[in-house]
């Protein structure tokens, strides 16, 4: 018997190391590790996938947020542009009555913001009309806008109405009536357009059509002062001068519409002008119409601030001239005032040949021959191809020589001017003045003052 530990237990310990269940092979332990590794990989994959998904969602959200911000910015920009456009149109519309030149700038800016919109172009045309630049208004609508054919019927009608009004102010009543008629295609036209349409028809001699428009105005409820004005215009067209005179005077005394007062003033002056032409034949129904025209026009220039209205100044010049020659009661200064008014017309930039001839006639009659010759110098410089200034000059020189002693007379300058006038005379010219001069030259030839 021994006290050492027994060795038989070693085998059991070895088995326990390799197989807890009592088996001897190590392979089942490696399989479990692979399973655990695969599980860990799947967890990592799932985590990575979740991270990628979260990143994608974040990126999508950021992109959507940026798109929303961009859309909001674009919307704000569009809104700002619309607000700016609306403000420009409103400001321009208000300025049309007070400062149409500035209104043109507003409408140009509005056109730049929305070039496809018709409204700023129509408003620009209206501003030209308000600025009294009628020729420019007409060319803008007809040439630059092509009568608005690219726009809808309503826009075309508005442009036709403006065009009709511009032609009316240019005294082209046929064109005015034509475009006013076209403006009705877009529906009812404004009272102002009806007014000018009726007046245009009356001045064209179409009294029945003018009366029809007036009836439409009554039916539409047009104000009494406007219909009274149109009725007076129709009376004037019918040459019922007394009725026309009282009608225009009533409008001047009753209406508060300054624009209508100016129209009535001008038309009343035209009544007096036409009657002044009848005074010389003794057939004027109105006494001393030229003198009345002077009073109406001179007062109108002061009352309505018409110092820059060349047509009013021209009418006043003619009224002074006619009153001087037909009404013995007027001051002698009327003839000189006529000259001053014609000079005022020239100062305002109007260049018409008859203005120079009228002014020359006045200075000649006043025996202010130096001023008469200066007027002829300006006439010839402005119209170098016209024969009239040379014909007048020859007559003037003949007058000046006739005032001298016979021994001091020299008609050579008159003959030279006469020959120049003959060289410039064209077949389509009114040869009246040349024929008068020719008679004077022939008389001088007969008397031996000049060679035949």
Predicted feature locations:
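Start-of-helix register in tetratricopeptide repeats
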Residues: 86, 119, 154-158, 192, ...
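Alpha-helical segment of the N-proximal tetratricopeptide repeat
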Residues: 78-113, 277-282
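Canonical tetratricopeptide repeat
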Residues: 123, 155-162, 196-199, 230, ...
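Terminal, low-structured helical/coil segments at or just beyond the last alpha-helical repeat
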Residues: 415-452
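Register position in tetratricopeptide repeats
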Residues: 97, 130-131, 169, 203-204, ...
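Residue-level recognition of tetratricopeptide repeat
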Residues: 93, 126, 165, 199, ...
